Amino acid sequence: MIIPWQELEEETLNNIVESFILREGTDYGQCELSLEQKKQALLSQIQQGTVVIVWSELHESIDIKDKMDLLK
């Protein structure tokens, strides 16, 4: 189930984003970005709708997924 980011409290959204970044160890290219820079980049993607926050009832977990991957 997709969770609309606009319905989340700011602190909750920030915690989800930070948890995702720390869990994924996402590669941001040749230059290393700070946690804050990574958070801002991911928040921007969420607000633009290119990625979405997803709740899995089966696994009882929350994740951030590329919207195009969900449409496949």
UniProtKB/Swiss-Prot annotation:
Source superkingdom: Bacteria
List, alphabetically, the SUPFAM superfamilies matched: YehU-like
Please tell me the species this chain comes from: Pasteurella multocida (strain Pm70)
- Name of the protein in its database record: UPF0270 protein PM1156
Please give the InterPro entries that the UniProt record associates with this protein: UPF0270, YehU-like_sf
Similarity comment: Belongs to the UPF0270 family.
Q: Which is a Pfam family this sequence falls into?
A: UPF0270
Q: Which Gene3D superfamilies match?
A: YehU-like
